């Protein structure tokens, strides 16, 4: 059996188009097609807690993942039958770093540091202490001071700094040393028996840098800040230079921002996935075209239309399908939204709706002519 692919992706400004750049209209639709493939195991890796991940899935119509690594790597959920099951063994794995102290106890050690402002209670958990800070904060000098205080208590921690460019605010997460995106991904890989050659990560911001430069196959979407791009390249060891892909746009007519960049990078590492993005299936070219055909009929004149998604598909429409449908009267290059139902439309309404995206053939039993 062919090895499956583990696609791990950050959410905000990676899959979610909630930055300043414009999203390619077809990108998330192609992501949905890809996620339907049994050969793809999808894991969201986010700073969000469970409720916010679920909210993002609903708001942006994202595919339901197989796994979710939340709270910047401090929680792991397995999703089956729409039920979210936490991995308690992951909590045990990371708990030893904090010597039994929870996030509230740690916060007392930093009460006098005025640039830091505690985030809302729902953004904290037992193993995640999160602060807001000015985006211009000199974090490179501050973090060693914080680490020194924790080390004096025998506490091992990691510090994740990033900037929310939309809200223009700095974000600082303090976690058990083992609790980070990279370790959580590796824990997931080990438990689900994925090797490095069948795993890929996508991200955009400072809290993704450790994974981006880890040697795992990784994608940096095109909308990432330039300083993140430069820092990722600086951290990347020479022997891992081929493991990081910088999305640049142009793939399948997409712009490389957000999910478009994820798809572009995935196809770079796994070329076979391009066909899955187009059709969601693994059939031959003719079978793919047959599966993507749709018949639309107007109710008043009984006009019929055969829709295919791209012009190239016309040359691959199987002969048997054409025989079933009858001969073709004429061909026009028009555009269609496939999700629109035309079952009750008249001819004029059909023509208007078909002028948006795609290609169609009007069907007739009399003659065949191209225009």
Curated annotation (Swiss-Prot):
First-level EC class: hydrolase
InterPro entries given in the database record: HAD-like_sf, HAD-SF_hydro_IIB, HAD_sf, SPP-like_dom, Sucrose_Phosphatase, YcgL-like_sf, YcgL_dom
GO MF, one example: magnesium ion binding
Region HAD-like hydrolase, annotated ranges: 1-288
Entries under Pfam families matching the protein: S6PP, YcgL
Membrane-spanning intervals of the chain: none
SUPFAM superfamilies per UniProt: HAD-like, YcgL-like
Keyword Heme: no
Domain (YcgL) ranges: 291-371
Domain of life where this protein originates: Bacteria
Keyword field: Hydrolase
EC number(s) from the headed UniProt entry: 3.-.-.-
Record-linked HAMAP family: UPF0745 (MF_01866)
Xref: NCBIfam families: HAD-SF-IIB
Family: In the N-terminal section; belongs to the HAD-like hydrolase superfamily.
Listed name of the protein: Putative HAD-like hydrolase Noc_2718
Organism: Nitrosococcus oceani (strain ATCC 19707 / BCRC 17464 / JCM 30415 / NCIMB 11848 / C-107)
């Amino acid at each position: 059996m062919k090895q499956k692919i583990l696609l791990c992706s950050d959410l905000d400004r990676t899959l979610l188009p909630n930055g300043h750049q414009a999203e390619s209209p077809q990108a998330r639709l192609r992501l949905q097609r890809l996620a339907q493939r049994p050969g793809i195991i999808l894991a969201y890796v986010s700073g969000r807690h469970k409720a916010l991940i679920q909210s993002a899935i609903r708001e942006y119509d994202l595919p339901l993942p197989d796994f979710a690594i939340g709270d910047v790597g401090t929680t792991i959920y397995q999703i089956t039958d729409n039920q979210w099951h936490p991995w308690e063994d992951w909590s045990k794995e990371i708990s030893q770093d904090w010597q039994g102290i929870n996030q509230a106890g740690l916060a007392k050690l930093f009460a006098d540091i005025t640039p830091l402002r505690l985030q809302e209670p729902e953004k904290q958990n037992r193993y995640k202490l999160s602060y807001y800070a000015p985006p211009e904060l000199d974090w490179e000098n501050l973090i060693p001071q914080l680490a020194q205080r924790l080390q004096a208590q025998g506490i091992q921690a990691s510090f994740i700094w990033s900037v929310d460019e939309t809200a223009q605010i700095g974000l600082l997460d303090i976690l058990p040393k083992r609790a980070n995106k990279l370790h959580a991904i590796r824990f997931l890989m080990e438990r689900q028996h994925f090797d490095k050659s069948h795993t890929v990560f996508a991200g955009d911001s400072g809290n993704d840098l450790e994974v981006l430069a880890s040697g795992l196959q990784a994608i940096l979407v095109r909308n990432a800040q330039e300083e993140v791009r430069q820092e990722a390249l600086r951290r990347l060891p020479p022997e891992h230079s081929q493991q990081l892909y910088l999305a640049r746009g142009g793939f399948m007519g997409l712009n490389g921002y957000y999910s478009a960049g994820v798809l572009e990078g995935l196809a770079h590492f796994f070329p076979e996935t391009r066909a899955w993005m187009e059709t969601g299936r693994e059939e031959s070219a003719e079978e793919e075209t047959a599966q993507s055909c749709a018949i639309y009929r107007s109710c008043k004149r009984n006009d019929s239309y055969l829709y295919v998604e791209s012009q190239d598909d016309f040359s691959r429409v199987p002969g048997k399908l054409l025989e079933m449908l009858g001969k073709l009267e004429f061909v026009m290059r028009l555009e269609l939204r496939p999700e629109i139902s035309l079952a009750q439309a008249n001819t004029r309404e059909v023509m208007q709706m078909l002028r948006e995206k795609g290609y169609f053939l009007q069907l007739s039993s009399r003659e065949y002519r191209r225009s």
